[in-house]
């Protein structure tokens, strides 16, 4: 009962904490959706650019490379964020195309070229990778280690059917007075052949100092509205997102689950039951 009470007490303050958070949300690094000019994929996979810079993968499953070409310029570009998004058209809601909703990002590569010399591509080194979650043996640092073999990369099992994000800082920021093209290549060569991203979005930041994953662009745009401008659906999206970030709530739920698990029966009791059953059987 102690665990149930702790959970109930915590849930009772949910509305108060939620309102406080939604009014003064510390959103961290400010991310901006990439201005995308074209998307393509190898191996008969089709990438479809949707609104809000969301990219959805369709068509044939297989080892593939996604190439996203965008435009940038003005402020220095310091980091790139990849959001892995869920959707009901994907197996188990995704965010990957594998049967269980997983994906394996083998490698992410970035290069850029100034508009005045569009063939003068310069490769950019990435470092300081971060992710909200990494599968055991598939840490996010694998996505920038240069190894494109079939069992290496960033993946997110068992946290499937959930939003995930990763960021990669540029070794040296791109600083250009004129606008330029930026190309991001996502290689997905996992040996299972199905482990590609199903739905994703790329964002960039020019923030200086410590860079963090920030919050999803969709949540960011809802937070920009005042409470009475938000639809019920938008308000619910905020609540779901806030719940997912409530570490204490997750810990309390876990403690309650553990407490509710039936305890294994004492072997002596099991033996006694078996003997009683024998004794109580009618004689022939």
Model-inferred region functions:
Residues 1-284:
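Low-complexity, glycine/serine/threonine/alanine-rich intrinsically disordered linker
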């Amino acid at each position: 009962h102690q665990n149930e009470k702790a959970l109930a007490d915590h849930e009772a303050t949910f509305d108060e904490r939620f309102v406080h958070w939604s009014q003064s949300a510390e959103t961290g690094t400010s991310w901006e959706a990439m201005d995308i000019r074209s998307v393509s994929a190898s191996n008969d996979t089709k990438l479809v650019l949707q609104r809000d810079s969301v990219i959805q993968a369709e068509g044939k499953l297989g080892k593939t490379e996604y190439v996203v070409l965008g435009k940038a310029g003005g402020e220095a570009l310091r980091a790139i964020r990849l959001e892995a998004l869920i959707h009901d058209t994907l197996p188990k809601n995704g965010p990957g195309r594998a049967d269980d909703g997983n994906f394996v990002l083998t490698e992410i590569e970035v290069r850029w070229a100034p508009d005045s010399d569009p063939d003068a591509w310069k490769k950019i080194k990435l470092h300081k990778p971060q992710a909200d979650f990494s599968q055991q043996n598939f840490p996010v640092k694998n996505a920038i280690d240069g190894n494109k073999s079939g069992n290496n990369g960033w993946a997110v099992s068992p946290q499937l059917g959930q939003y995930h994000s990763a960021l990669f800082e540029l070794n040296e920021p791109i600083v250009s007075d004129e606008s330029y093209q930026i190309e991001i290549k996502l290689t997905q060569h996992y040996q299972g052949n199905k482990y590609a991203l199903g739905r994703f979005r790329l964002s960039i930041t020019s923030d200086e100092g410590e860079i963090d994953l920030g919050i999803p662009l969709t949540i960011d745009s809802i937070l920009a509205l005042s409470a009475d401008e938000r639809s019920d659906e938008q308000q619910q999206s905020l609540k779901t997102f806030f719940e997912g970030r409530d570490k204490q709530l997750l810990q309390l739920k876990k403690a309650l689950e553990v407490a509710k698990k039936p305890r294994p029966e004492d072997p002596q009791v099991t033996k006694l039951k078996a003997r009683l059953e024998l004794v109580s059987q009618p004689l022939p």
